[in-house]
Regions:
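Alpha/propeptide regions of enzymes that mature by internal proteolysis
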Residues: 2-87, 94, 108-147
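Long, compositionally biased
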Residues: 89-103
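Short, structured patches in soluble enzyme cores that scaffold and shape functional sites
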Residues: 98-102, 112, 129-133, 155-163
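Beta-rich nucleic-acid/ligand-interaction surfaces
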Residues: 148-155
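Conserved small/polar residues in nucleotide/adenosyl-binding loops
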Residues: 166-171
Length: 171
């Protein structure tokens, strides 16, 4: 099972069958073999297909996949220092904030309880990023992830922002 192979964050996952991964790949125009970058800490090539496998396991819908790819690409930017995030003993994790028309198109929550339960897009996009870090790069607790306490963000931390609301804009 995925749990026995240490591919999960402790929560149940959707088995990444060939058919499910193929459907996930159809959610984006990127080629399956395209390399997004090297995933720390082991600096393994993060291909679109490998990210798709983790998006399936996280429970993402194919229409969420472009956001997942963008989040992974951003996390791999050297300026973000993903390796440092894994090497610290501090209780830090990744945060994915989504803006633009895609937030409505995929049904993200930006109106309240954005970090809470009940929204599949918010929950699974952040989880897909974390599973990719774990399964592609090797960022596993008590091994290469050195956080002393961990963080709920290491399960998934993603929401949409509401900058279009005029009452939230600075004047």
């Amino acid at each position: 099972t995925c749990y026995e192979k240490d591919w999960t964050d402790g929560l149940p996952v959707v088995p990444p069958t060939e058919e499910r991964v193929y459907r996930m790949l159809q959610g984006s125009s990127w080629e399956a073999a395209e390399v997004l970058g090297k995933m720390p800490p082991f600096n393994i090539s993060a291909t679109v297909e490998k990210v798709a496998i983790n998006a399936v396991m996280a429970g993402c819908k194919p229409e969420f996949f472009p956001v997942v790819l963008t989040a992974v690409k951003a996390a791999l930017d050297p300026g973000f220092c993903l390796h440092g995030l894994l090497a610290t003993t501090w209780f830090s994790g990744t945060l994915c904030i989504v803006n633009g028309p895609v937030r409505e198109a995929i049904g993200m929550n930006w109106q309240g309880n954005v970090l809470g339960q009940g929204n599949r897009a918010n929950a699974t996009i952040g989880r897909a990023l974390q599973l990719a870090i774990r399964n592609i790069g090797g960022g596993k607790p008590r091994e290469t992830d050195q956080s002393a306490f961990g963080s709920p963000a290491k399960v998934g931390f993603c929401f949409a922002e509401a900058v279009s609301y005029t009452h939230l804009r600075a004047h």
